[in-house]
């Protein structure tokens, strides 16, 4: 007989800086209410995201009945990647009136390539359109 599947008791989605997870909020309270060993998660997450230090990396944590957990890291949010490539701190407060920066078509393609595993797109062109739309809604113009 195949081994019995563990029963899932919770799914937690967080956005944490890579290599900088610690038991302080928001990580501690989110995991604590599900009875997960917080330090164990922090060590595992920090080890898994060490190479992406400085970026915000979303994580999806699945908590099981026996309080064990598994987690899947995602690609950094598109908005963060756009800000990084445009070299700005934050997007425009009035995106359709005030433009704050420019990104080239090549930069959009690069971001789309990075985000491809997490995007709901069939090919790179569709992914580029999604990223360009995100850039426009942040007040960043796409050149080319």
Curated annotation (Swiss-Prot):
Keyword Secreted: no
GO molecular function: large ribosomal subunit rRNA binding; structural constituent of ribosome
GO cellular component term of the entry, any: cytosolic large ribosomal subunit
GO biological process: translation
Known partners and oligomeric status: Part of the ribosomal stalk of the 50S ribosomal subunit. Interacts with L10 and the large rRNA to form the base of the stalk. L10 forms an elongated spine to which L12 dimers bind in a sequential fashion forming a multimeric L10(L12)X complex.
Family recorded in the similarity comment: Belongs to the universal ribosomal protein uL11 family.
Protein name per the record: Large ribosomal subunit protein uL11
């Amino acid at each position: 007989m195949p081994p019995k599947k563990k029963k899932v008791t919770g799914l937690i989605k967080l956005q944490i800086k890579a290599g900088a997870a610690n038991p302080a909020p928001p990580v501690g309270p989110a995991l604590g209410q599900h009875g997960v060993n917080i330090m164990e998660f922090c060590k595992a997450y920090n080890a898994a995201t060490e190479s992406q230090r400085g970026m915000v990396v979303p994580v999806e944590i699945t908590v099981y009945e026996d309080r064990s957990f598994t987690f899947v890291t995602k690609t950094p949010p598109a908005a963060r990647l756009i800000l990084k490539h445009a070299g700005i701190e934050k997007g425009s407060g009035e995106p359709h009136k005030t433009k704050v920066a420019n990104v080239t078509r090549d930069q959009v393609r690069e971001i789309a390539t990075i985000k491809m595993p997490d995007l709901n797109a069939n090919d790179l062109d569709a992914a580029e359109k999604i990223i360009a739309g995100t850039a426009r809604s942040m007040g960043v113009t796409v050149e080319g």
